[in-house]
């Protein structure tokens, strides 16, 4: 075995090194300044401790604090410091798990008396002390027996359970920070001092051990950490903005929807909210129609045999709502399920009747109501529900048509997002996972096509960021994931394009090829909004409730100053409605400022104020949401202007093109 390794650096240069050299020594050999800034290193994309030996040849990178990958290390290390601080302050507390999550980290603790928000400042202060000590992170590999004995002696029963769960043959890594240690896969930075002080503990919550309600309840402490104070403050400011924009609060203020205990995870839509929902459906329906989709509707309840054939019963049964039927003899003992996905139903529609290669591509779309079980603790307004509407479509095509169809889908998705003001989009290709169906040759072809498509997308637009997610594809094929950035910088994964070799084969779907032989179609799953409910939640928060005029459930309120203007206000409202606008009149005997405040709280885009003078002159005083300005104009002028603004963007393009 060779004692030297060949390392390729980011600039393309290749050098030989002793295999036993550590990452820290490698950084030192390049430059002392780099060694000071280094927090970890990576070989062939795998991040390692600086204390790890090189071991093997590959592409090497020194990771500094400025590298995006360092953020996960900072948060991981901060979680360990949190655990140490808790055990210093509250002896007898057991530590369990503490992973990095999106935008931060958490750690779960077992303690007789749960932590409260009042404990967080004290814990945070102790964490800063530990960081100031600048203790090195060091790693040891223990035997299973030693690990169980040590943690058992410490009274750490949860850690003993974690040790038992680690597969035989896998190293049991123990990381020390000074004298304190924890079971951990790593990697870590060189010392606690490299964490810095740009962190904050955010909240406490209850969490069942291993997410099982039959297990003990633990206390979870959430925190966040960043590479510098500017990033931390920007994040905290974003959270403040997000709280102001919370769609649940705005939903109440705007009278859009509500939830209640008798229907956990399902939406009670009020009239205004349902109007907004229908606006979204109508817009999407027009877009699909113009792109050659056929809208269909498949049953919501189907026999489990269909779900067994599709594979959902085996892969997804625990997340499905099951129904047993106590009917006549033919129905006894049958088990049905509410559909969690639309795809199996669409395959049945495709199979109904013989299809020729000349018929392809066939594009089936549905605004399908689906139901998926989510733990009650995971439910979150419109963003995480149990019953929702999916803007699903499935394109049945030949393998040769796959690239062109993926590009057409991409054009449609980006166009829809642009119409709602989302132009910062990231598209990532998720490639084959370890567990998958289909031959490697089939995956090679599909990934090659989608890689080419991704490159074409990247070249077409400067606003589009692209990337690869190795091993993150569905078991049945590779997929694109579309993530959009909202007005306050948050990212939301919405659209998907997934290639499926599996479902057509499972159901025996085929078309007749040019050679008169049966061929299996490629099936492309496509969603733009994803969950329509969730997309509406995103829109409400993105616009802070101030929806574009064309999308608002109530577009105009005609409000009177005095009763002298009541008849004129009714006449004005009738003309506005006749022009196609969504109008409400407010003739109440209230002061006009009170009316304006109330309708502004409900985020009505335009208020037309009518008094005695306006009634005499056939004018209106226009006030827009968020503006102090008032503009006087004739009623006809107001109607013309508002009708233009209230035209949906897709129809406006058609109008301008004509």
Curated annotation (Swiss-Prot):
Pfam family, one: tRNA-synt_2b
Catalytic, as annotated region: 246-548
InterPro entries: aa-tRNA-synt_IIb, aa-tRNA-synth_II, aa-tRNA-synth_II/BPL/LPL, Anticodon-bd, Anticodon-bd_dom_sf, Beta-grasp_dom_sf, TGS, TGS-like
A molecular-function term among this protein's GO annotations: threonine-tRNA ligase activity
NCBIfam families xrefs: thrS (TIGR00418)
Subunit: Homodimer.
Homology family: Belongs to the class-II aminoacyl-tRNA synthetase family.
Designated name of the protein: Threonine--tRNA ligase
Name of the encoding gene: thrS
